A protein has these predicted regions:
Chain A
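Alpha-helical transmembrane segments of multi-pass integral membrane proteins
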Residues: 27, 31-35, 108, 156-192, ...
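Transmembrane alpha-helical segments in multi-pass inner-membrane proteins
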Residues: 72, 211-300
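Single transmembrane alpha-helix segments in multi-pass membrane proteins
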Residues: 37-87, 112-122, 191, 196-200, ...
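Cytosolic-side transmembrane-helix boundaries in multi-pass membrane proteins
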Residues: 1-29, 194, 200-208, 278-320
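Alpha-helical transmembrane segments within multi-pass membrane transporters and channels
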Residues: 79, 89-131, 266-269
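Extracellular/periplasmic helix-loop junction at the C-terminal end of a transmembrane helix
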Residues: 126-159, 165, 186, 283, ...
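Membrane-interfacial amphipathic/re-entrant helices at transmembrane-helix boundaries
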Residues: 1-52, 81, 88-89, 93-95, ...
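Generic structural signal for small/hydrophobic residues in well-ordered secondary structure
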Residues: 44, 68, 81, 107, ...
């Protein structure tokens, strides 16, 4: 292999890589039309929402390195915002937008004190805030309290509409993530993650940057919550505000490949599909599985599935 | 020709207490534009503390710091960048998971004259790498660089923020003799291109050979200030720091 | 409010502070020596509670004694966990993300083990002592709370003694204050860290056992206390027992007196409100003040 053939091979790889998201999008957009299976549609719908929250979390946790255990707050706020607005007669799509805004505002309330803490302290603070919000929402009257809240939608239930809404949301999230990654915003986040003080020494304002990415991530997660609420037509604090929701949101990008663009997508798909299977067959061990997975990933392959795959690929290439 | 512009750095009676101990006491000095201004002092003299206060890492207990007439006392580092003051680190702090070019690119994006476009920022970053003499390392991971190159990366990164004043924290620490003289040449080039340099150093020979003006600290107070020749022959300085007869530049 | 009522509340707060303190020292020791934020602390507290429950129900051992008996068992478990898992983490002078996620994963595993072994119904340790009351003048105190408080003080006292009068304790304090210097003077980091980790887990179990006498629990037990431990650590500083005591006292006072204004369900929100307030008034909390001091280098 001479130099020019390596360059050409590299260009070919690059073209594959930029075509991949579009190919995937097309495949997913067409599949419900080609394969008629309501179960598959439902599975993919849920997976798209997971992918969205996974990508969103990764913006803050992967790019900026701020690990939050409290994303259920935004998911739940989004869910309840959409639910309340729809019951007041608002069209779902503006309601989703309102969910994004509410979630982003809440992220400010959380972030302004919490980002004064660094690293793990921030993480624990998010656990507490998330729990505090759940407690408050469980006790609140007009949202139905602990017994939950029902959405009444006076339109026929069209599964495909939900499907494409969720797919669009996931696509938007992916686009945002890909654009941010190599632009000024993304570099600033990476700098903060790698050395916050050195980043400040070259002009990055860590506090406002963290607040900004937090708001973006929260907004995306809030819309996901809203889309879920509309689909499910019934939500309750133990579910959408539950700690396990925060855990799942965090697990996906870590499993898939934290800090990358495709990692959260991979993690979202793996999680969505595996969760369906596990919850069906072995409901009592799913914490065990996720906990062990997390431990194994941290100790042996911090780059997650994507990291492991890259290593294998490189070794394979090296052998030629 | 007398420089009538406001000084690029004006430190006025700056003091820093840690508990009951004054690490820096009533230090005042000025740095004029277009100089290389150095300060030295024995261990514990308060050099690092003073540097940290100017670089925004510490707040003075009292006193004021000004740049071009504006009060910059206690400003955070990212604000100082916008005021045209950038620093290097004594123990290098590259962004280890980025390549050399990306390290500098960050600085270009967030410097005094920030550039938003990634392509344009990369261009400007290459320029900075060229000025620092490490453009050939642009695609290398920052973590594998030698100490000498990492120090140059610190400088390239700081320069990429378009500073009027560059604060160098013991930039020659850990360098070989020839690397040191190359580094000093680089500092002279930086000064000649219009950026003022303020330089804290342990290495007396380096400081005296490159600086236009030197300030000597001892026990947190200013002991002397003047040209290298003046400092080397000042008896108080000799007694406190240099010990015996000062080694001449030759 | 009468003086008697006020004093009652203060006494209540004091008793609570003792519990909170012993609950937090486990986390503090591990953090101080290894800069690891031990999220699995909650899981080990939960195990301690269940272990004490088992000893009480199967062997009719007094629950307080059972709590103390959990210490050696949990100490060994802690040592094992350190040997198998924690040791593999890279050493650091600052808390790292991988260590956080590792301990979190461990917590999930422990929770699940709890569910598998004991199911998800609430359990509690119920003895005649639970309902009885001690009268100090006009104030009546729940006996079990008083006993637990005394036990907590004993623990803290023992820990202080170990830290200040044993060779091991000195190594631990050396590592806490300056890891590199400690290594240079010959402290065996791995061995000391292993023992310190075991100690931290041991105290977690012990605290869990004591708490089990006061509150009902299920395998998710510990999350609320974990958060409180964190609030205490941020309030009082991370690296000294006296700091923990101060933080515990402040939190206990705030929580106890807040019952006058706010329904009991909102307790956790109060603790967090306190933390938020501290962070706004003292930006960065105490943890980042320490980080700022380190930044000088």
């Amino acid at each position: 292999m001479n130099a020019s053939s390596v360059v050409i091979a590299g260009q070919r790889v690059a073209r594959w890589r930029s075509a991949l998201p579009w190919a995937l999008l097309a495949a997913l957009a067409l599949s419900p039309l080609l394969i008629s299976s309501p179960n598959l549609v439902r599975l993919l719908f849920t997976t798209f929402l997971w992918v969205t929250t996974s990508i969103a979390w990764n913006l803050l946790g992967g790019f900026a390195g701020q690990v939050s255990f409290g994303f259920a707050v935004f998911y739940g706020m989004g869910a309840y915002t959409t639910a309340l607005l729809m019951n007041a007669g608002v069209n779902p799509y503006p309601a989703f937008l309102a969910s994004a805004v509410t979630a982003a505002l809440v992220s400010l309330v959380v972030g302004l004190p919490a980002f004064r803490l660094r690293g793990p302290y921030f993480a624990i603070a998010t656990i507490g805030i998330s729990e505090a919000v759940r407690v408050v929402m469980t006790n609140l009257g007009f949202t139905g309290g602990a017994s939950g809240y029902r959405i009444v939608e006076h339109r026929p239930f069209r599964q495909l509409e939900h499907y494409y809404t969720a797919l669009l949301l996931a696509a938007i999230a992916f686009a945002i993530s890909a654009l941010v990654a190599h632009a000024k915003f993304g570099l600033g986040l990476q700098a903060i993650r790698q050395d916050e003080d050195a980043a400040a020494d070259v002009g990055v304002n860590p506090y406002t940057y963290k607040l900004a990415v937090h708001g973006l991530a929260a907004g995306l997660t809030g819309v996901a919550g809203g889309v879920f609420a509309r689909y499910a037509a019934f939500i309750h604090p133990g579910g959408v505000f539950g700690f396990h929701t925060s855990v799942h949101i965090l697990l996906m990008p870590v499993i898939g490949g934290i800090g990358t663009v495709w990692g959260p997508v991979l993690g979202g798909f793996v999680f969505g599909i595996v969760e369906e299977e596990i919850v069906a067959s072995f409901p009592q061990v799913h914490l065990l599985i996720y906990g062990s997975l997390l431990i194994l990933i941290i100790l042996f392959e911090p780059g997650g599935i994507l990291g492991g795959a890259r290593k294998l690929f490189r070794r394979f290439r090296g052998k030629r | 020709m007398e420089n009538v512009n406001p000084p690029i750095l004006e430190v006025e009676k700056v003091t820093k207490y840690f508990g009951g101990l004054a690490a820096v006491k009533d230090v005042s000095f000025e740095v004029r534009q277009g100089q290389i201004f150095g300060f030295i002092g024995p261990n514990g003299a308060g050099k690092t503390t003073l540097f940290s206060m100017i670089a925004g890492a510490l707040k003075p207990s009292s006193g004021r710091i000004r740049s071009l007439g504006r009060d910059i006392t206690g400003l955070k580092p990212f604000k100082l960048i916008k005021s045209g003051i950038a620093r290097t680190h004594q123990i290098v702090r590259p962004f280890r998971e980025m390549r050399v070019l990306e390290n500098v690119q960050v600085a270009v994006h967030f410097g005094k004259n920030p550039i938003t476009s990634a392509t344009a920022a990369k261009e400007r970053a290459m320029q900075a790498l060229r000025s620092a003499g490490i453009d050939q390392l642009a695609n290398d991971p920052a973590s594998i660089l030698s100490v000498g190159h990492q120090k140059r990366l610190e400088i390239a990164r700081a320069l990429a923020t378009d500073p009027d004043l560059l604060l160098c924290d013991e930039i020659c620490g850990g360098l070989t003799h020839s690397e040191t003289s190359d580094m000093l040449q680089l500092l002279r080039r930086i000064r000649d291109s219009g950026t003022t340099v303020m330089y804290v150093e342990h290495d007396v020979k380096a400081i005296t050979s490159v600086c236009d003006r030197i300030m000597v600290l001892n026990y947190g107070r200013k002991l002397a200030e003047g040209t290298p020749e003046h400092i080397q022959s000042d008896p108080a300085v000799i007694e406190a720091y240099l010990g015996t007869r000062a080694p001449g530049k030759s | 409010m009468t003086l008697v009522d006020f004093t009652s509340l203060v006494v209540s707060a004091l008793l609570l502070a003792g519990i909170y303190a012993v609950m937090s020292v486990g986390m503090t020791v591990i953090y101080g020596v290894m800069k690891i934020v031990n999220l699995a602390h909650a899981g080990f507290m939960m195990l301690g509670a269940y272990f004490a429950l088992e000893l009480f129900e199967r062997f009719h051992i007094d629950p307080i004694l059972a709590a103390f008996l959990t210490f050696p068992v949990m100490f060994l478990i802690g040592g094992a966990v350190h040997w198998v898992l924690v040791r593999k983490l890279p050493h650091s002078d600052e808390p790292t993300l991988p260590s956080l996620l590792l301990m979190f994963g461990l917590w999930l595993v422990l929770q699940n083990l709890g569910y598998l072994i004991w199911g998800n119904t609430d359990r509690s340790i119920f003895t005649p002592r639970t309902l009885s009351v001690v009268n100090l003048g006009p104030i009546s105190i729940s006996t079990v709370r008083l006993v637990v408080f005394v036990a907590a003080l004993v623990c803290l006292g023992l820990l202080q003694a170990v830290l200040h009068y044993t060779w091991f304790g000195r190594s631990v304090r050396a590592l806490i204050q300056n890891r590199r210097a400690a290594l240079i003077v010959g402290v065996y980091e791995d061995r000391t860290a292993g023992i310190a980790f075991g100690l931290g887990i041991g105290f977690a179990g012990l605290a869990g056992g004591l708490l089990g006498s006061l509150y009902s629990f299920d395998p998710d037990f510990g999350r609320a206390f974990l958060i409180r431990a964190f609030v205490i650590i941020v309030l009082g500083g991370l690296e000294s027992i006296s700091g923990v005591a101060i933080g515990a006292l402040v939190l206990a006072l705030v929580e106890t007196f807040s019952i006058l204004f706010v329904p009991a369900g909102y307790q956790l929100a109060i603790s967090f409100g306190l933390l938020a307030l501290v962070l706004i008034v003292l930006p960065g909390g105490i943890a980042s003040l320490l980080a700022k001091a380190r930044r000088l280098a």
